[in-house]
Regions:
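Extracellular glycoside hydrolase catalytic/binding regions
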Residues: 161, 177-383
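Short, solvent-exposed loop/turn segments at secondary-structure junctions
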Residues: 19-20, 54-56, 117-119, 173-177, ...
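Active-site-adjacent substrate/metal-binding segments within catalytic domains
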Residues: 2-100, 326, 349
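An active-site-proximal structural segment forming one wall of the substrate-binding cleft
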Residues: 30-47, 73-117, 127-171, 196-207, ...
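Aromatic-rich peripheral "rim/lid" segments of glycoside hydrolase catalytic domains that contact
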Residues: 68-73, 361-418
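Aromatic- and acidic-residue-enriched carbohydrate-binding clefts of CAZyme catalytic domains
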Residues: 60-94, 124-140, 263, 277-314
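Hydrophobic faces of well-ordered beta-strands that scaffold small-molecule active sites
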Residues: 9-17, 46-50, 111-115, 167-171, ...
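The substrate-binding groove and active-site-proximal loops of carbohydrate-active enzymes
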Residues: 16-30, 70-94, 130-148, 174-193, ...
Length: 418
């Protein structure tokens, strides 16, 4: 597919994810969409990537006229990136989507449509109706349901004369790590998921044959790239290299539910004084359903909520030297492998997220000298292989502290633009 000539030669992408509708309360970063876009343009961005909540707005049959996004309940999750939702905002879902696109038009920006709905978006709902509606869809049909919802969403934008702001459409975010894989057998979810995704892409193309559509993948699934549907119009990957962060996660069994959680070591090495035990840190009873609606596990929420950010950062810095070369090599290898797949398939390449991994809200490892060096290295490599678009960093967005590092974002976006 030939991309529309009105789209930018390079997409400089800021990751607004679901935050553009969860963080709209007084004083929150998306209370004023014009200001958010103005700040993005000042930093060198021309594109934002969002969860457009397509299933909720166009597939669920739920009333979306008065959405009141919520956090995970009380203080639970309030020191986690993306989950520190203040609450207090109320939006008309479809009207807010239209306002986002109108603001994008005013600031000459573009939007990548996506969905996080089978990962965590419904955990921010006022109640569990959104989550239950998603889970009621047969797993074999979920990509097709998303395709229909996104097609309806685009029809809505066409009616309002705003569809030229769409850069491209993703059926879903990080598909192999989402509930799109429910019921699949085998270890290789990338390969096993391909038939479902192919049906979803085909369904979207039936509705909008001249609009680019794709899916995206966590990391770069080297060894499983045969599972990426050949019908995608854009190759999209998220090269999170982790490295030393993987060592931290493994040391304390933060994501490995098959091992006992390292309560005392994590308390001794990472947590703030007075932290409760993991078993005692839960959402209020009325909010516990939210843990079903997000793919982030209780251990990770607990450690992010209760870690001392300085101790977390120090733990990583103390061990980084042992991982530096491997992390740099992985980044380069993944970017080259992604570029090779895209070139072989004749489609443009985009890195929609990156580059190290998921760190606590107030941690600065990815924003500090190590992380900034990875941002520079990643955008240089992205430019070298001819990527159509990339982020500076997943954390370079209005909902994160890194937004204040204007100089780094301008520098990296200038490299991406060439």
């Amino acid at each position: 597919m030939t991309l529309s000539p009105h789209l930018p030669d390079k997409l400089t992408i800021s990751l607004w994810d679901f935050s553009w509708y969860t963080r709209t309360g007084p004083g929150e970063p998306f209370a004023d969409l014009d200001r958010a876009f103005e700040e993005a343009v000042t930093r060198g961005y021309n594109t934002v990537r969002i969860c457009a909540m397509p299933f909720l707005l166009f597939g669920s049959r739920l009333d979306t006229g008065k959405l009141r996004p919520s956090g995970l309940g009380g203080a639970y999750g309030q020191r986690m990136r993306w989950y520190d939702v203040g609450g207090g905002g109320e939006i008309d879902g479809r009207a807010w989507l239209r306002e986002l696109f109108e603001a994008a038009l005013r600031h000459d920006c573009f939007v990548i449509l996506s969905s996080w709905e089978y990962q965590q978006s419904p955990s921010f709902g006022e109640d569990r109706a959104w989550f239950d509606a998603l889970m009621a869809v047969d797993p074999e049909r979920r990509p097709e349901a998303l395709a229909d919802a996104l097609a309806d969403l685009i029809d809505f934008l066409v009616i309002h004369g705003l569809d030229d702001r769409i850069a491209f459409t993703e059926l879903h975010n990080e598909v192999q790590g989402s509930r799109l894989t429910d019921g699949l057998e085998g270890q290789d979810k990338v390969v096993a998921l391909r038939p479902r995704l192919e049906r979803g892409i085909a369904r979207f193309k039936e509705r909008h044959p001249n609009r680019p559509v794709t899916v995206n993948y966590a990391k770069v699934p080297v060894g499983s790239l045969r599972g990426v549907p050949r019908e995608v119009d854009v190759a999209v990957f998220h090269p999170y290299v982790y490295g030393v962060l993987d060592e931290l996660l493994a040391t304390f069994a933060i994501r490995d539910r098959g091992r006992p959680f390292a309560q005392e070591p994590v308390r001794r090495e990472l947590l703030r004084p007075g932290a409760p035990d993991l078993a005692d840190w839960t959402p209020p009873p009325g909010d516990r359903w939210r843990l079903e609606a997000t793919t982030v596990g209780p251990r990770e929420i607990y450690v992010h909520d209760w870690c001392d950010p300085d101790r977390w950062d120090a733990w990583l810095y103390d061990r980084y030297a042992m991982h530096r070369l491997a992390m740099e090599q992985r980044l380069t290898t993944w970017i080259e492998a992604a570029a090779d797949w895209a070139a072989g398939s004749g489609v443009p390449l985009v890195f929609g997220e990156g580059w190290i991994g998921y760190t606590p809200l107030h941690g600065t490892f990815e924003e500090g000298p190590v992380g900034a060096a990875f941002c520079r290295r990643a955008v240089e490599e992205s430019a070298r292989v001819g990527a159509w678009g990339a982020v500076v960093c997943s954390n370079a967005a209005p909902q994160h502290p890194m937004w204040q590092d204007i100089a780094l974002q301008r520098e990296c976006n200038a490299v991406l633009r060439g």
